Amino acid sequence: MIKLIVGLGNPGAEYTATRHNAGFWLVDQLAREAGATLRDERRFHGFYAKARLFGEEVHLLEPQTYMNRSGQAVVALAHFFKILPTEILVAHDELDLPPGAAKLKLGGGSGGHNGLKDISAHLSSQQYWRLRIGIGHPRDLIPESARAGAKPDVANFVLKPPRKDEQDLIDAAIERALAVMPTAIKGETERAMMQLHRNGA
């Protein structure tokens, strides 16, 4: 069963529409669907809501610590409510998936994502669920003929808003991910994963 859903992003209006905040977009949508309001909760270092989703009580969290310190918020809430790593789902932007793709998986490395790296360090575990929301990679914007030796600026890419066509694809992927949330929250995470991946996300 999933008891805590975390969306990763950076705090501040200047980051709201940037690719790195895709995790926030998903949690914002979940809160809206539940009629819950995310409020600043200092003991959890983020915006927090307790929501009733699909008949289950679920904690929603958006760390306000900046991305590379996200673990501080996650571990504070997980310890307070005695939530196990396997009961946590972290939604985050994923460079290695194109816009329009979303994948669910349990465990694994950080893939260079500083938010995941910090969460794994604070939990002393990598065994939590990740919802990877594809944002594409800056190398995809470089003409193939010019890619050899090119060094795409990843930091600049993730801190910029997606193009309109990319945003539409990302929004569609988030909708597909939301459609499998009832299954995931009730603990049928493997089934949710198969549904999401089968639906072309």
Swiss-Prot record:
Swiss-Prot/TrEMBL keywords: Cytoplasm, Hydrolase, RNA-binding, tRNA-binding
Catalytic site: 20
Binding positions for tRNA per the UniProt entry: 15, 66, 68, 114
Site (Discriminates between blocked and unblocked aminoacyl-tRNA): 10
EC class of the enzyme, as a word: hydrolase
CDD domains named in the record: PTH (cd00462)
GO-annotated molecular function: peptidyl-tRNA hydrolase activity; tRNA binding
SUPFAM superfamilies (alphabetical): Peptidyl-tRNA hydrolase-like (SSF53178)
Site location (Stabilizes the basic form of H active site to accept a proton): 93
GO biological process: one example: protein quality control for misfolded or incompletely synthesized proteins
EC number(s) on file: 3.1.1.29
Signal sequence interval, chain numbering: none
GO cellular component, one term: cytoplasm
Record's function text: Hydrolyzes ribosome-free peptidyl-tRNAs (with 1 or more amino acids incorporated), which drop off the ribosome during protein synthesis, or as a result of ribosome stalling. Catalyzes the release of premature peptidyl moieties from peptidyl-tRNA molecules trapped in stalled 50S ribosomal subunits, and thus maintains levels of free tRNAs and 50S ribosomes.
Subunit text: Monomer.
PANTHER family in UniProt: PEPTIDYL-TRNA HYDROLASE
Protein name, per record: Peptidyl-tRNA hydrolase
